[in-house]
Structures are given as C-alpha cells and as structure tokens.
Amino acid sequence: MKKLEYYLKDAFYYVLSDVKKGIVGGLLSSTSGAIGAIFGIILSILLIHNINPNDVVGLDNNILLTSLIVASFGFLIALIIGFILDGYYVRVMKTTVENYDVLPDWDDIAELLKRGFLYWIGNIILSIIFMIVPILFIIFGVFLIFLPLVGIVFIGIGFLLLFVSTIALLIYEGLAEVNYSVKGFSGFFEFKEIFRMINLNYIILLIIVGVIVIVINFVVQLPFILLKIFAISPARYSTFSSSETIVDVISAVISAFVGFYTAVFAKRAIALYYKDRVEELKK
C-alpha cells in the first residue's frame, strides 16, 4: 500500500489535469446549483406569503404559483444535470482504477446519465439497508411511548444504532461506489469483499479527505455568510429580501462550482486506495 500522502497529492494534481474538462464540470454543477437555489427561494417565498402576506409585497398567489411551476421544470433539469455529474464521478473512479491519470472525457452523455441514475439508486438502497433497523427501533419507541420506560429505551437504542449505522454507511459507501464503477450495480452490495478492504489507513484517509472537503466548502461559504450577517440582515425590513436572494444564488453557484472539484478530489483519492487494496488482497 502507498502512503496516504500519495493519494492526497495525486488526487489534487488530478483535479487540475485538464482545465477544460474541469471547467465543463464546474459550470454544469453551477447551473444545477443555481436552479436548485432559485427553486428553493421561490418555494420559500410562496410559504412565507401564505403565512404572512405582508412579508412579500407586490406578489399574489397566481404569480408565485406560476413561478413555482416554471422553477419545478428547472428543478427537473437540475436533477438531470445532477445525474450526469454523478455519472461523471463514476467514470472518474472507473478510469482511476484503470490507471488513467487525467480527467475523463464528457462524451456519451446518455451513458453518464444512466450510470449517474443507478449511482443515485444504489446509494438510496444502501442508506435503507444501513438505516432500517435503527429507524424501526425509533418508530417502535414512539408507538410504545405510553409505556414510558420501554418507549424511551427503544428510542434511545434507536438513536444509538442510528449513529453507529451512519458511521458504518459513510465508511462503506466510498468503496462501494468505486466497486460499482468497476463491476456494475451489483458492486454496491458485495458486502464481504468491501468490508475486507476496510482498514485503519482507509478510515484515516476518509477522515482527512472529509476534513479537506468541509474546510474548502466552509471557506467558500464564509464570505457570503458574513455578508448576510453584517451587511444584509441589519438592513432588512421584511422576511423576504431581494439582496439576500441574490447573495444566496451567487453563493449556490460558486459553492457548486467548487463542489465539483472537491467531489472529483474525493472520488479520485478513494479510488486510488481501492485499486491498491484490491491488488494487495490478491497477493
């Protein structure tokens, strides 16, 4: 096995290996982020208007509903773009295992869409598998709340299992995603093989990658958070602020653009570990 620094350095340089392909991904991600932000803002305005019409001046329900319908179509477009991006991440992982050292092409969009959709479905199924037991414990606890001690015990055990299952899912799904990129949909569920690949080095790598991604995203978001707190919020006279809306959209665009690069970085680092670990286990 190579040192963890190798995976991190390689993943960093890999992200910058083809500027044009990276920009394409960043712009697609930004488009999806902008549409999603606008949809969320319109939905929020509609809810605020229904609760307190005085907070949204000059708009009636017809205008808001029309805007929501248009935004919903936009949301579907954003969802499709999201599947394409997920398909590209799958291609990044697959080509990494195949020893390619540059960002893959954006060709065969239909294939990216298909692989991205299956990637999404696979992750949902994994979430259900890992979360079903703790959720059932919590539900039983709620139904047994009339028996205070029994209900509280079930709920407590449920939340404890939920915490453990969440950690287990986060550890498992990184390698499962790479396995899917190599072997197809069934690769998500090769539990024995994937758990064999997990060791302390992998967990440390996962933590480091996670911290790097979180820090980068926080640094990108921080100027917009400070702007909203110190410049926009004190000047607001209503719940809805056009200035804050513009800041939210710009923040979503920039965060999504950077998010594409951090996602590629993370997928590359984990795929490199997967490749080396598979070779090591074969010996």
Swiss-Prot record:
It is a multi-pass membrane protein. The chain crosses the membrane at residues 28-48, 65-85, 113-133, 135-155, 200-220, 246-266. It is found in: Cell membrane. This is Uncharacterized protein MJ1189. Pfam families: DUF4013. Keywords: Cell membrane, Membrane, Transmembrane, Transmembrane helix. To M.jannaschii MJ0233. It comes from the Archaea. The keyword Membrane applies. GO terms for cellular component: plasma membrane. It comes from Methanocaldococcus jannaschii (strain ATCC 43067 / DSM 2661 / JAL-1 / JCM 10045 / NBRC 100440). Its main location: membrane. The keyword Transmembrane applies.
